[in-house]
Amino acid sequence: MIERGKFRSLTLVNWNGFFARTFDLDELVTTLSGGNGAGKSTTMAAFVTALIPDLTLLHFRNTTEAGATSGSRDKGLHGKLRAGVCYSTLDVVNSRHQRVVVGVRLQQVAGRDRKVDIKPFTIQGLPTAIQPTEILTELVAERQARVLSLPELKERVEAMEGVQFKQFNSITDYHSLMFDLGVIPKRLRSSADRSKFYRLIEASLYGGISSAITRSLRDYLLPENSGVRKAFQDMEAALRENRMTLEAIRVTQSDRDLFKHLISEATSYVAADYMRHANERRIHLDSALVLRRDLFSSRKQLVTEQYRHVEMSRELAEQSGAESDLETDYQAASDHLNLVQTAMRQQEKIERYQSDLEELTYRLEEQSEVVSEASEQQADNEARAEAAELEVDELKSQLADYQQALDVQQTRAIQYQQALQALERARALCQLPELTADNAEEWLETFHAKEQEATESLLQLEQKLSVADAAHSQFEQAYQLVVNIAGEVSRSEAWQTARELLRDWPSQQHLAERVQPLRMRLSELEQRLRAQQDAERLLQEFCKRQGNAYQPEELEALQRELESQVEELSLSVSDAGERRMAMRQELEQLKLKIQELTARAPVWLAAQDALSQLSEQSGEALEDSRQVTEYMQQLLERERETTVERDEIAASKRAIEAQIERLSQPSGAEDARLIALAERFGGVLLSEIYDDVTIDDAPYFSALYGPSRHGIVVPDLSLVREHLQGLDDCPEDLYLIEGDPQSFDDSVFAVEEHEKAVVVKIADRQWRYSRYPEVPLFGRAARENRLETLYQERDRLAERYATLSFDVQKTQRTHQAFSRFIGSHLAVAFDADPEAEIRLLNTRRGEIERALNAHEDQNQQQRQQFDQAKEGISALNRLIPLVSLLLDETLTDRVEEITEELAEAQEAARYIQQHGVSLTKLEPLLSVLQSDPQQHEQLQESYVLAQNSQRLAKQQAFALTEVVQRRAHFSYTDSAGMLTENSDLNDKLRQRLEQAEAERTRAREQLRQYQSQFTQYSQVLASLKSSYDAKRDMLKELSQELVDIGVPADANAEARARARRDELHAALSTNRSRRNQLEKQLTFCEAEMDSLQKKLRKLERDYHQIREQVVNAKAGWCAVMRMVKDNGVERRLHRRELAYMDGDELRSMSDKALGALRLAVADNEHLRDVLRLSEDPKRPERKIQFYIAVYQHLRERIRQDIIRTDDPVEAIEQMEIELGRLTEELTAREQKLAISSKSVSNIIRKTIHREQNRIRMLNQGLQAVSFGQVKSVRLNVNVREAHATLLDVLSEQQEQHQDLFNSNRLTFSEALAKLYQRLNPQMDMGQRLPQTIGEELLDYRNYLELEVEVYRGADGWLRAESGALSTGEAIGTGMSILVMVVQSWEEESRRLRGKDISPCRLLFLDEAARLDAKSIATLFELCERLEMQLIIAAPENISPEKGTTYKLVRKVFQNHEHVHVVGLRGFANEMPSLPPIAAELQQGG
């Protein structure tokens, strides 16, 4: 017997009060005992969370919230956890003895919503020695541990060999694995399934009779019969499809003639237009090719003319360029001549200005000397006038002083004072402290002598200074000349530089004299160089035209070669005419042959189309008429063989259908009469009792019962005896077996099992040996397996029958097609292909035309070569005389050498011209530069000192004279003497004043005269300087202009320039004559090109026009061809015989078909619109779209499952054959598919009966359950009255309601709903559809009502309601119901899980204090009998004697809260207690 799986332990990590706690679970009952808040509910919540980790369902409320619709926000889970990572795991050992740890990682999510994050996971293959806490925690110290995170846990588990860790992102996957491993009793596929499971656990946890479960007991206890519903749905879908197909066949039959007419006219309409466009496209392509050939030939001719034009244009451009160059050179030469003449005139001006400057220089020097002398005299006169002025002023002052002192004493005193002042002034000025009035006269003579001596010294210095000035001016003149010639030099190096300049002067003069000979030589060489360059240019042009590079020495041999080539080309051109004539004659013959074959082609093509259709139909390559007749005989033989095989297949198919019908009987009865007999006898078919036997056990039971496996089990055979009398409608052998149908087993037989056989001892003297059948049919699974095989075989035979029927009809139609072909096309069908011959002839014609074109091109090329050779000879005639000049390689070097010498000579000439006069002046002054008169400055300084000494001497003499004159004033000691002396002095002063004024007047007059004379001299000097500066500036400008002109200014240069100009004028005239000649030739060439371009433009216009038509047609044609190929209608539209009809005939054919189509599609809006659009002649693709639309319309109208082809044309051919056969077959199929209402009633009744028996079996397990006054619990199953009436009507009175079930407009479900409404008119169905109501009526669960009843005291059987029971009784009753539900789920899911898996059974019970000891003992007994585990929570005063009990005490130590747990293994006499579980690990950190 399979051992049931068990939960071994529950582990809580980091829960509130439980840091790392593992609860070992008892095999029966585990009791959590403790006071309020000890952690009992927390432990159960951890178990439930690990079992169902769905936050949408979890809600842990205490009993005070039992009826509340909303509890705390966290639904009781957030507050049970501690911060950080938390775990809840279940250690399970299943029926296969596999250890599985399933659990969840929980973690509080920060926020006001107090959410919890849950991640389910599983660990498989964990060794038994390892506890879950060892995996989930890590020791940090001796009494400290750390909780691992989920990634760390995964890493630790995966490091263990053979241990698998799996994390789940979906609760469905988590529960799927738990179901496969036998942890949960039912596969939880959806959230609704999880909700049912949670509601069951919740009802178990909180105890009592859960209204959520009792109201939905049908959903919890009764399995959904999805197979029956699906069978009904498939049957209805098949019937619906069958009816739709039959309706489509009827419509198709009515439209058959329309289809034929539509496809025929559409093919004519579109194919005619299709081939007309194809013909026009081919014609346009041929025209475009002809125009393109003419265009290319014209372009080639134009290219030739353009080449000639380009060559002549190039030569003309070269001549024009040369002319432009010559004109430029001529203009340059003329300009050069003008420049030379200008330079000559400029040189004359320069020479004239140089002579004027020399004269002005001489006059300027003379005038400078005169001005210098006048300046000196002016200075002397100014000094005398100043002295006279001073003397007059002094005398006037003295006289005024004396006149003011009319008082004698006063006057004398003043005079005495003035005399003393004069004496002091004389002492200071003469530096004579010993001077007195007595010795003043002596000193006056001395100082008069000094004055005379200073004057004489000044005159001597003036003479020396004049001589030094003359020498200094010569040195400065010479030095300035050297600086002008050689640039800045020092005064000490001036003589050496001047001597070198005078030494180089003769060589420069010699070079300047060579300018003219060198120019003449250079002119000759340049003329020869230009001739050489012209010859090289002619050679380059010749090489360019010839396309090869030739050396000058090769030209004579080339001339001889070109002359021979001209002779050969003249001979080859003469032979071209004869060949051209022969090719044209052959071309005309080919055209006549092509016309003849074109007339034969349409008849041959029609025969080939018919032959190709026959080949496609037959699959044979028909190469001659003999094969055609032989194949007709083969068709007749094949038709006979196929007909025989078809009849055989039909017989086999009928036999299989009969077998299917027999196996499809309800309850497995092979004969439908057995079902009626079983109802009549009040028994049950044996096959119905064993209907649930597995397919593996079916062979054994089939052999065990042998022929009696189709017998009827009745409770009492004696009651059946009277029914057997007069029994006629029954099988030949009817087996009746006595037994209880509810508890029937196979113990009535004595059986011995053998290999694939059994021996049954029927009696002491009668044994039966039965082998296992190869195809067992006992039991629903075996029958369904056999039916599936038979269905496949029937479908295969049906397909084969349809194929054979189609082949017969196809063979008949193929034979008719062969007959028509022999009568119409056999005479011409096997002739040679005229189109192939036409293609060959067209190929030959193309070759001849290409040969003609090539011949014309070759002839034209030869003519061009002939002309080119003649031009080459002409050019060589000009080049050969110039070969010696071309070979002169030193000419350029000589020109460069002479050019350099001429540049040196011109430079020397310019030097002589610029500095010749200066060198001439410098030559006589060379000796002056040897000594620099530096003493001139010292002499000037001495002269200035002498002037100052003379002026001082004059002032000293004047001061002494004044003292001498006032000498009498020193004797004024008394007033009389003073008056007398004053009168004399006044007279003397007046006399002296008159003399001084006269002297002053003379000095002024003389100063005015000298000033006037000095002004005149200065003006003359300024005028000379201005004239000198102007002429010098003009000379510089003229010299600069001459330098800017850049040409030599000599007579030979003018002659050379004039000769060069005349030479260029002659060359220009020659070039212009050649240019005029080229322009005339170019005009003729351009006229020819214009005519060719006009022709070319016309050809291009015509070509582009027709090419545009071709391109547009191609774009449309490509779209047309793509549409044609994509839709597979090319074979229908491309009718080659139409290619030989002209456009008018095809257009007429298309128009006629269009008229017929308008009438044919008048009632079809879509086709009418598409046809109207297709009439646009510019959009040929729309006709194809119309044809495709017609095909699509026909495909839609012709069912592809009826007609086995995608081509509507072939479908029309098959329609007449296939539609009749399908109509007959589908009608029969509908009759077979239609299920009778009686059969439906029987299926539902049998299902209800089977479920009632299953509920009775479940009730047997609850009969001994008692809680308080409740002595027993049972589940009552009843059929609803309205639904029972429906079943009776379906089975007994179905003939009265055939209007519903035989209606083609109603499905069976809808008919069933209508019948239900008819039987229960008082019921309001609301807005639900009949289809929905009918589908509900096909579900047997809707026919049943389930109620829980309890047997309580004197009241007997009562409906289990919480109000009628005590709390303990309600808890016990609810637990009983939950056990029944779990058992039902296990049986329902038995087929879905492995046969070696018996799932775990575990329920909860919180707050077990409401149960008395007897009730708790009853729970223990129930758990032991049902192999169920139970976890109950009880107060401290309850300690069951059996099972495992955990004492929970919550303690607080150092602000840390933990639960102290002690475990006991019962305390009855026979059960020794377990030692206390070790204290839990202290909380880490």
Curated annotation (Swiss-Prot):
Keyword Coiled coil: yes
MF terms (GO), sorted A to Z: ATP binding; DNA binding
GO biological process, one term: chromosome condensation
Entry-linked InterPro entries: MukB, MukB/SMC, MukB_hinge, MukB_hinge_sf, MukB_N_dom, P-loop_NTPase
Keywords from the named record: ATP-binding, Cell cycle, Cell division, Chromosome partition, Coiled coil, Cytoplasm, DNA condensation, DNA-binding, Nucleotide-binding
Protein localization: Cytoplasm, Nucleoid
Coiled-coil segments: 337-480, 509-605, 780-805, 835-915, 977-1116, 1210-1235
One GO CC annotation: nucleoid
Primary location group: cytoplasm
Location of the region described as Flexible hinge in the Swiss-Prot/TrEMBL record: 666-783
Residue numbers binding ATP: 34-41
Domain remark text: The hinge domain, which separates the large intramolecular coiled coil regions, allows the homodimerization, forming a V-shaped homodimer.
Family label: Belongs to the SMC family. MukB subfamily.
The protein's assembly and partners: Homodimerization via its hinge domain. Binds to DNA via its C-terminal region. Interacts, and probably forms a ternary complex, with MukE and MukF via its C-terminal region. The complex formation is stimulated by calcium or magnesium. Interacts with tubulin-related protein FtsZ.
Purpose of the protein: Plays a central role in chromosome condensation, segregation and cell cycle progression. Functions as a homodimer, which is essential for chromosome partition. Involved in negative DNA supercoiling in vivo, and by this means organize and compact chromosomes. May achieve or facilitate chromosome segregation by condensation DNA from both sides of a centrally located replisome during cell division.
Protein name: Chromosome partition protein MukB
Species of origin: Yersinia pestis
